[in-house]
Amino acid sequence: MDEASNAFEYIRTLELQHQKKKPTFSDLMDYLDIKARKEGIPLYGQFELTPLCNFDCKMCYTHLTREQMGDRELLSTEQWKKIIHDAWNAGMMSANLTGGECLTYPGFEEIYLYLRELGCEIVVLSNGALMDEKWIAFFQKHRPRMIQITLYGGDEETYYRVTGHRHFDKVIRHIKMAIEAKLPVAIAITPNKYMDEGIFQTIKLAKELGIYYNISGILTDPKEETGRSGQDHNLPVDGHVQILVYRNQLEGIETIPIPPEKLPPPGGPYHEWQGCGLTCKAGQSCFTVEWDGKLYACGSIREIWAEPVRIGFENAWNHVRQEALKYPVVPECIDCPYESVCTNCAAIKTQYAGKGRRPLLLCKQTQFLVQQGVMRIPDCR
């Protein structure tokens, strides 16, 4: 789509192209994101209020215990409010509150209400175990943009294998309470090897709940300090195929495999440096501030960070943005025939092959998913 001169033109173009009867707030944010990336405005912020959690998921990239935190302390509520205010002054319009489990942070309510006072849209990322009557009433009174609850299984045994706790019944009860309260709630599913066959019951349950659900792909490697890094928590690629075929069956979508000889080889025409810069929102229009006050372009790219508590938000954001613009692009990914379905995540590509290097195994896995008919690329049927 050619760049529109203003938001109204952008929305009209969407209506013409997709016959949308009622443009959404997300459509407006998409337009603002285009502008924000160009101008270097931090439109989206993610705030990891705490690394502490009431779950102990085997594949979690961030959860720490009190012992692992050592003598480090959580930021105070006032410190968070200062960072948030400065981010809002710099252009932030949307904030994700996460953890760990963000509802365990003592100042959650105050921070949440402060974001509301500033006029930011808020997404709450939670495991749902604490989302009881008290929190349901709170969010009814002060509605978020979305509450995203991660579902780790379809029964107590799967929950125990993944999270170390049998909280399945409690989480499902809380999700149903949120739905009954007409709160905007969505389900996230994170496939991993610990779910085993329980993944299919999890997807079926998410479908039966009748709300939006999303199935994520490749897991990013946990932070080294968690003690879970360097381990393979992912499903094999054929496991992802089975999951997506099952999802298609539930959604009434036909899965049509494609003969290998009809598929183009992965990789674009370039094999030498073509430029730099993260190709996602990270460091362009979004940022993450973690529990210890460090600001990252992306929490999965650990070498790009700054300290807004020490140098101020504006200086921290500008530093992170400049470093993000230097991040090497994989030349073979440019104009690759699988570009529209392959991950756009630089952290995952780096996880496969190192910075700026072609992730050959990821290329083969993406081609395999297209061959199996669970992903589709243009002009290939």
Regions found by a protein language model. Give the residues of each.
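Cysteine-centered iron-sulfur cluster-binding motifs in ferredoxin-type domains/subunits
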Residues: 48-56, 283-284, 333-340
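Short Gly/Pro-enriched turn/cap motifs at secondary-structure boundaries
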Residues: 37, 275-280, 324-327
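Conserved alpha-helical substructure of the radical SAM core
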Residues: 2-146
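Residue-level preference for beta-strand/loop junctions
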Residues: 41, 51, 280-281, 330
